[in-house]
């Protein structure tokens, strides 16, 4: 069976071996401890997770951030977003083809009393904005609950292996993004008036100002005085025929696979977009041992920092300005 895991990286340390057994369409596979289903499938060479309900075209991942549902599968009888759910020992994973059926559960569902939690401020999102807001509020003595749908805080900072530019005070210049995330998290956790709930999603805001959240499988009502929304970036794709096929990914999904989960989605890569995200993603690919066959930008010049572009040029990456993709 092919293994697409990155074992050697100039910045990141590869985690332990894949020892958690699971199956995909009846085929035995292994995942790393805590690895999400989508990354485990990619590491085992699976790129097609299902097929589009309209035309039957193959579907894989797009955002790998829990937003688009394109990577949905059936895991142990439940329809889940594969990029958000960790593999469990013995888990049976199948494609979500058509409508999911009802699970075979004995007896009626057991309901529990819903807990209501009060707080001064509820922050939705544990990325750089949410963490920074929590720090400033905590300094002022404000009670905060900070929630994030991932298992770890930091948002997109977790995916950034390069060193940041700017001033040291304003944006931690000279520090890698992933290390900035750890610094901000440590600072937030040092305040007793901040409660952190990971693997938690806000589901609804009711007319009485209560917020329904799903916290690690349990429903909780939060009654905040103020709601601060810091839900972060979303993938935006260039519109062209075939842009949802396996092999076409958002930059964030690519960085999630390569930099967070150390999984190589391909051996060769072409990047669309010469802004900072595209330029940096191309460099991340080179760090992971992926051949970047080119980068295109529709404008006359790349819009990202020249230092990022020059780095790619020095490493032999062809950059095509005034070019785009049509299909």
What would you call each of these model-derived segments?
Residues 1-117, 218:
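Signature of N-terminal electron-transfer/Fe-S-associated modules in redox systems
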Residues 30-35, 60-69, 123-132, 138, ...:
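Cysteine-centered iron-sulfur cluster-binding motifs in ferredoxin-type domains/subunits
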Residues 55-57, 75-122, 159, 180-268:
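FAD-binding core/adjacent interface of flavoenzyme oxidoreductases
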Residues 57-63, 172-181:
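Aromatic/His-enriched, Gly/Pro-containing loop or helix-boundary segments
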Residues 109-149, 232-302:
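Rossmann-like dinucleotide/flavin-binding elements
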Residues 151-175, 235-247, 304-308, 315:
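Conserved N-terminal glycine-rich FAD pyrophosphate-binding loop of Rossmann-like flavoproteins
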Residues 182-213, 222, 286-327:
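A Rossmann-like FAD-binding core segment of flavoenzymes
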């Amino acid at each position: 069976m092919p293994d697409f895991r990155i074992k050697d990286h100039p910045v990141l340390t590869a985690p332990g071996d894949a020892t958690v057994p699971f199956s995909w369409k009846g085929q035995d596979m292994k995942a790393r401890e805590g690895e999400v289903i989508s990354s485990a499938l990619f590491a085992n060479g699976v790129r097609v997770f299902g097929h589009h309900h309209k035309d039957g075209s193959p579907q894989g991942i797009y955002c790998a951030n829990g937003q688009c549902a394109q990577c949905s599968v059936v895991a142990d009888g439940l329809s889940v977003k594969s990029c958000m759910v960790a593999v469990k020992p013995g888990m049976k994973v199948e494609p979500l083809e058509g409508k999911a059926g009802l699970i075979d559960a004995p007896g009626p569902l057991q309901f529990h009393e819903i807990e209501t939690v009060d707080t001064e401020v509820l922050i939705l999102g544990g990325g750089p904005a949410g963490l920074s807001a929590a720090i400033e509020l905590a300094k002022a003595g404000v009670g905060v609950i900070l929630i994030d749908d991932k298992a770890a805080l930091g948002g997109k900072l977790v995916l950034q292996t390069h060193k940041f530019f700017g001033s040291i005070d304003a944006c931690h210049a000279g520090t890698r993004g992933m290390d900035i995330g750890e610094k901000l998290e440590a600072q937030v956790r040092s305040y007793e008036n901040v409660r952190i709930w990971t693997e938690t999603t806000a589901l609804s805001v009711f007319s009485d100002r209560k917020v329904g959240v799903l916290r690690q499988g349990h429903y909780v009502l939060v009654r905040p005085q103020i709601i601060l929304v810091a839900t972060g970036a979303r993938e935006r794709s260039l519109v062209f025929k075939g842009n949802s096929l396996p092999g076409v990914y958002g930059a964030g999904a690519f960085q999630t696979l390569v930099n967070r989960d150390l999984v190589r989605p391909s051996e060769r890569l072409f990047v669309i977009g010469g802004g900072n995200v595209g330029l940096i993603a191309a460099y991340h690919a080179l760090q992971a041992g992926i051949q970047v066959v080119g980068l295109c930008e529709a404008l006359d010049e790349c819009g990202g920092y020249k230092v990022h572009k020059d780095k790619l040029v020095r490493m032999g990456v062809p950059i095509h300005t005034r070019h785009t993709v049509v299909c």
